[in-house]
A protein has these predicted regions:
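Glycine-centered, small-residue-biased loops immediately flanking beta-strands
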Residues: 28
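Class I S-adenosyl-L-methionine
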Residues: 1-13, 17-21, 31-32, 37-173
Length: 173
């Protein structure tokens, strides 16, 4: 495995995080879908750019596929039947990825101000709990939305329209 992938990914994120901070209004939310293995690098890059890490929302995708390889198959191809049997329940890779972290950042509002003041000035900064409860009934940082056939598009990691709507309603008027 390439041990530099994580650091290279952080450098990539750093290449645009500052620009996002520049164009957003104070108090604006920014949601990043980050893989479980690299979410920490996104958090570091965005904090270093000046964002505030507000929360992590857990999205239960429900229908994620297990892609972990059975190690016994490797031994079978090697004609090593003893180890194939010995390790038949063992896998290489990750668990079924039903959880995807959604990282929630905000652009800081002006020093000396408050979120209440920022809401009046920019219309953003707080969140709408009642709208969020339509998607996460207990109002917590966990959401279950399944991809529909109509959500499939040209991007390999396209997200469900309902999920995007939930995030928009959470953070904007």
């Amino acid at each position: 495995a390439d041990r530099n992938i994580s650091k290279e990914y952080q450098i990539f994120i750093e290449s645009f995080a500052s620009e996002w901070l520049r164009v957003l209004k104070p108090g604006a939310s920014c949601f990043i879908f980050a893989g479980r293995r690299l979410a920490h690098r996104v958090i570091i890059a965005f904090e270093d750019a000046g964002f505030v890490f507000k929360d992590m929302i857990g999205w239960n995708k429900k229908n994620a596929m297990l892609k972990a390889q059975q190690i016994s198959k490797v031994y079978e191809r090697r004609k090593d039947l003893e180890n194939s049997e010995k390790y038949k329940e063992w896998r290489v890779g990750n668990l079924r990825p039903v959880f995807e972290p959604i990282l929630w950042f905000i652009k800081p509002y002006k020093i000396g101000g408050t979120i209440s003041d920022n809401m009046i000035e920019n219309g953003i900064g707080a969140y709408n709990l009642e709208k969020w409860k339509k998607y996460s009934p207990k109002g917590n940082n966990y959401i279950e939305i399944q991809s529909l056939a109509s959500d499939k598009g040209k991007h390999p990691t396209q997200k469900p329209l309902e999920l995007m709507k939930a995030l928009i309603e959470l953070s904007t008027q």
